[in-house]
Every structure is written in C-alpha cells, then in structure tokens.
Swiss-Prot record:
SUPFAM superfamilies (alphabetical): Aldolase
EC number(s) from the headed UniProt entry: 4.2.1.41
Pathways involved: Carbohydrate acid metabolism; D-glucarate degradation; 2,5-dioxopentanoate from D-glucarate: step 2/2
Highest taxon in the source lineage: Bacteria
Organism name: Bradyrhizobium sp. (strain ORS 278)
Name of protein: Probable 5-dehydro-4-deoxyglucarate dehydratase
Length: 314
C-alpha cells in the first residue's frame, strides 16, 4: 500500500516532469519483466516527478485485468520509493474499480482514470463513473479528460466535493477555452497535467494556464532531452524550446502521424534505437517499417544527448 496521501502525491507530480514507461513484451507478446525492471531503474536516474505504469504508452488497452497489477507491482518494487508510481485504469465502471483496487493493493501511489471504452455518456453518468472509482480506493485519482469522457467544469466541481481523493486533471483535448474554464473554476484544488500526444508541443502555452507539468512519452528513450526541454519550459526559455521543437519534436511527429497507432509504436521504436529494445507492440497496433526505423534512428542520433542514453544501455 502507498505511504503517500492523495494530496502528497498530487503535489509531487505537479512539481516536475511525468512519463509513461512502455510495457516491454517478449517475442510471444508476454510481459518482459526483466527488461521492464531495467528500464524503470534507468528512468529513475533522471529528474522525473512520477511514472505511470500500465498507462496509455504502456499499452493499458492491450493488457488484461490481471496483467495491470502485475506490471504495477514490478514498477513499485523496482522504483523503491524513488518516484511515485501511478497506475492506469479504465473501461466500464466495474472493470475500472476492479483494476483500481488491484493496483492499489499492488502498491500504486495513484491512478489515472482513462475514458470508458467506446461509449459516450451524459455528464451525470460520467460523474457517477468517476465517483465509483474514486470511492473504491484510498489513493489519489487523476481524471483524463479526452475523447468520450469530457467532464465540464461544474461536473468536475461537484466531483471534487464528493471525492477528496480526486486530486488531478489531465487534459487530452487541447480545448483552450475549456482548460481555462476548468482552472478558473477549480484553482489549486487540482493538479493539472498536459496530456496531449507529444505534449512538448503545447507545454509552454499550457504553463500560462496553470498546467505545471505534462507527460512526456519521449522521456522513455531520450530522457536527458526531455528533462532539459521541461526545464526550458519552466524558465520560459523560448529559444531552447523552439530549437527542440524544430530539431526533434516536430520531425518525430511527422513520422508518428503517418499511421494510426504510431503514438505508441514510435516510442517502442525509440527504445530499440538506443539499445533498450522493449519488444513489439501488441495487436492491433503495428510496428514501424524498416524505412521509418531508419528515419527515426537518424533523428535520435542527431541529438547531442542521444549518445548518453545509448551508452547507459550498453
């Protein structure tokens, strides 16, 4: 069980960069615990405020309900309290509660509540869903506002009154007006996380709206670049930010946008580039082609900080 209160967890993750480690798989697509332990230990050596086990980049959608707590338990064991470990949960309410409780038992410090599977629901239904998950555990919960689970400010305010352990709001929409209304309504009651794909692109404007942190997928394979970029965002160092976007982030996005599902696939490909091969993505996702791998390799190796990541893997 976590030793952190929901409020302590929220304060910690709001103080620095966050990331979602990939879930390594073997050739037969089974969980590769050895590689996962190695990756988690390595990532903990960098300045990161929280790691999300079995999150979106960790292919939560392809894990079974039994695999999620298994992955979380390994993450908690390997990080050894160096950083908070948060777990993904989602799907329908019954399954989300089941995964939430098993993740709490496995030692997770908090939860990221992903949108329910496929269905669109009214605000009252979404609110009841979030409340049911929050009340099934004692650890802190972060709601992920995106796709078919968009909570409006008034709904969020009511949930915060009913659920003291609802401590975070992750935005995956990019609706500036909605984000402004949420922050204006809730203020410092919540910790706000930027959660758009390749969040570095939106980090600076979001900082001015009270979003002090974001989840960096590229932290998985270029952690030094990711932490340097985050530091530049906090300092509002426009020159460094724009150089990072131009030289790395935007070219990476160009490769990612070629095929559906590449938001996850390209991160696992990046792990392979630096010598930390974490196996294939699970179906229905597909891996990068050889030509795309060559492009990504050239892009990563052009980074001055890429050499240190590769040396650490050797």
């Amino acid at each position: 069980m976590s030793k952190m209160t929901p409020q302590e967890m929220a304060a910690k993750i709001g103080s620095g960069l966050l990331s979602f480690p990939v879930t390594p798989f073997k050739a037969d697509y089974s969980f590769d615990e050895t590689t996962y332990r190695s990756n988690m230990d390595w990532l903990c050596g960098y300045d990161v405020a929280g790691l999300f086990a079995a999150g979106g980049t960790g292919e939560f959608f392809s894990l079974t309900a039994a695999e999620v707590p298994e992955v979380v338990k390994v993450a908690v064991d390997e990080t050894k309290g160096r950083v908070p470990v948060l777990a993904g949960t989602g799907y329908g309410t019954a399954i989300a509660r089941e995964i939430a409780m098993s993740a709490e038992k496995a030692g997770a410090d908090g939860l990221l509540l992903l949108p329910p599977y496929l269905m669109h629901a009214e605000q009252e239904g979404l609110a009841a869903h979030v409340e049911a998950v929050c009340k099934s555990v004692k650890i802190g919960v972060i709601v992920y506002n995106r796709d078919n689970a968009i909570l409006q400010p008034d709904t969020l305010a009511r949930l915060c009154e009913r659920c003291p352990n609802l401590v975070g709001y992750k935005d995956g929409i990019g609706d500036i007006e909605l984000m402004t209304r949420v922050y204006t309504k809730m203020g410092d009651r919540l910790t706000y996380i930027g959660g758009l794909p390749t969040a570095e692109t939106f980090a600076l404007p979001y900082l001015d709206m009270g979003v002090t942190t974001y989840s960096s997928a590229v932290f998985n394979f270029v952690p030094e670049f990711a932490t340097n970029f985050y530091a530049a965002v906090r300092k509002r160092d426009h020159a460094t930010i724009h150089a990072g976007l131009k030289d790395f982030i935007l070219p990476l996005i160009a490769i990612r946008n070629r095929k559906k599902g590449y938001a996850v696939s390209i991160i696992k490909a990046g792990m392979k580039v630096i010598g930390r091969d974490s196996g294939p993505v699970r179906l229905p996702l597909t891996d990068l082609t050889e030509a795309e791998m060559a492009e990504l390799t050239a892009l990563v190796k052009a980074l001055p900080v890429a050499a240190s990541a590769q040396q650490a893997a050797e």
